[in-house]
């Protein structure tokens, strides 16, 4: 279930209710990712499963969204949900299944991305595609420079963030890859992006669990700019 994520993603359609009136127990996560009791900010209107989304399409060879015969039809440890207002589209990190899902406003699957093509040496398979590994964060934005739609992904266990274009319902192409900065200013031993966003100038801001000095900032060309 992704009730907590949908509560945030569909906030505009939900109503604030008193804690005592909630038909369920609300929770949040502390620094150690342990669930702790919390007051509810919104009432959940709907919960959605992989079956509701139509994820069985991903294992149907006759479907244009076919990924593989054993593509999971269930969600696994979904970590992030982003709503693209310009295109009325939801994007989800189905983290445990190492993939990104694109959904319509009825939360039906319209795209599934397990990786991308492009120039990288990280997690590249025999087919030349680089695959995602436990992606935790996603952000989608249309560029003011070229009017293209870019998808920014915090590819956590591959120790990178990526910027991609969407080519079809199953294919992405790499535009820019962001890895651990090679500078003394970045003194953490690891680079483990968990959340990501971009501004109008296409600077990106990456939240890393191993960094406590702010988000890691890169410019449009992938150069480390410091912390924000």
Which sequence ranges carry the predicted segments?
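Sec-dependent N-terminal signal peptides
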Residues: 1-10
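Sec-dependent signal peptide cleavage junction
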Residues: 12-23
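Eukaryotic scaffold repeat domains enriched in small/polar residues
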Residues: 21-228
